Regions:
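C-terminal binding/interaction regions
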Residues: 71, 115, 119-120, 133-163, ...
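Conserved helix-loop functional segments at active or binding sites
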Residues: 52, 225, 262-266, 351
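Histidine- and/or cysteine-centered catalytic micro-motif in compact active-site loops
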Residues: 68, 122, 236, 244-247
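Gly-rich Lys/Arg/Thr-decorated short loops/hinges at beta-loop-alpha junctions or inter-strand turns
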Residues: 22-34, 107-113, 187-206, 283-305, ...
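Alpha-helix N-cap/helix-initiation motif
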Residues: 35, 39, 212, 245, ...
Length: 390
């Protein structure tokens, strides 16, 4: 197939809309549904991300995309009992690719509502069954088992978007886009992110475990496909906070750090002990948890309101309890798509348990940034590579 025609572009008034190749066939096939313009943008960006993660780590990878940025990305590592609980994972053994997607979606379940899923490996029954219970717009993968395809074709009254990508496809060396009738050209960003980029450790502490290296790679690869400016927090092979599309670096660091804090607070014993009413929908449960751990907790705990969500009225999770729980976070990695201009980014990252930093370096205040990292015994690598994405 040489072209596809979505119903419209980014908005319903933007017609006509078309996807095409200058030469040859499109490297993808729509197996079910009718993806829209933004769906395809999410699909192609997310596929590049998971493909790069698989290449860099050798592990199955998955991503959950919304509006051309990842809400989460993860590697296919086993789920702990706590993770199974907070991500609503089914009991029993799960395939690595299913674990990857469950973790990717679990990074920020509110932002993943209505997501586009991407898998580095063939979609299997485990992954399809989990997706079937979630609110999602579509999926891209290099293949599907018969069982998975049957499950996915039954989602959204048969309209769920399923796209298969040719894993051998390599884009042209020059990419083009038009803005306001003017054509822009640039070289395709084929930068290979690997462990060689992590060799320039500029802090006094230079100890990097393999897990820390993998987390740095995950952070950097996620940033490569996130709208800039962006900062990404990672722990144990999954993103836990992505701050995308901000105009200042510190706002990226704060936004992503706040998301990381929320991810960690979802594991607080009080949250794990919440007793929800029977047959509550997953999105309603996600929203209730998000409000419960926020400063607006009365919105779900007020008399006459909590009964709609909980069997038993929960105790308030106090500010002191939240601060004490967040203070226990450790072993977190943060990556930045451009240099940290001031040490304040390191100070904010530390509050969310950051121990490892990967950033390009190159600020006129690098000495201040390094000194701040040294103050907390952090390990910081200067990659020398900027990762802007627009």
């Amino acid at each position: 197939m040489k072209e596809l025609e979505p119903k419209y572009g980014c908005n319903p008034n933007q017609k006509p809309a078309r996807l095409s190749m200058d030469q040859g066939e499109l490297p993808l096939e729509v197996l079910n549904g009718r993806p829209g313009y933004i769906n395809f943008m999410d699909a192609l960006n997310s596929w590049q991300l998971v493909r790069a993660l698989k290449k860099a780590t050798g592990l199955p990878a998955a991503a959950s995309f919304k509006h051309v940025s990842p809400a989460g990305a993860a590697l296919g590592l086993p789920l702990s009992d706590v993770e199974r609980h907070i991500y609503f994972a089914p009991e029993g053994e799960l395939s690595p690719i299913a674990c990857a997607y469950i973790r990717a979606r679990g990074a920020d379940r509110l932002c993943s509502f209505g997501d586009w899923a991407a898998l580095s490996d063939v979609c299997d029954g485990d992954t399809a069954r989990f997706l079937a219970a979630e609110v999602s717009d579509g999926i891209i993968a290099p293949g599907y088992t018969d069982e998975a395809l049957e499950i996915l074709r039954g989602k959204r009254k048969g309209g769920y978007n399923v796209v298969e990508i040719d894993p051998s496809y390599t884009p042209a060396p020059i990419e083009r886009r038009s803005i306001f009738g003017i054509t822009f050209e640039q070289g395709y960003n084929d930068l290979d992110i690997n462990e060689e980029m992590l060799q320039n450790v500029v802090t006094e502490n230079k100890e990097l475990s393999q897990q820390a290296k993998n987390d740095m790679l995950l952070s950097l690869i996620t940033l490569k496909y996130t709208q800039s400016n962006s900062v990404c927090y990672v722990k144990n092979g999954m993103t836990i906070g992505v701050g995308a599309g901000q105009q200042s670096r510190i706002h990226c660091t704060r936004l992503a750090g706040n998301k990381a804090d929320i991810w960690w607070l979802r594991q607080h014993p009080k949250v794990l002990g919440l007793q929800f009413v029977d047959k509550i929908r997953r999105p309603d449960r996600d929203n209730a948890i998000d409000i419960y751990i926020s400063d607006e907790h009365d919105d779900v705990l007020a008399e006459g309101v909590w009964q709609n969500t909980f069997k038993v009225k929960p105790e308030v999770l106090t500010a002191e309890e939240k601060a004490a729980w967040i203070a226990q976070m450790s072993g977190v990695t943060v990556g930045s798509d451009a240099f940290f201009p001031f040490g304040d980014n390191v100070e904010r990252a530390r509050k969310s348990g950051v121990q490892y930093i990967a950033q390009p370096g190159g600020s006129i205040r690098d000495d201040q940034v390094i000194a701040t990292a040294n103050k907390y015994g952090m390990v910081m690598a200067f990659t020398g590579i900027r990762l802007f994405h627009h």
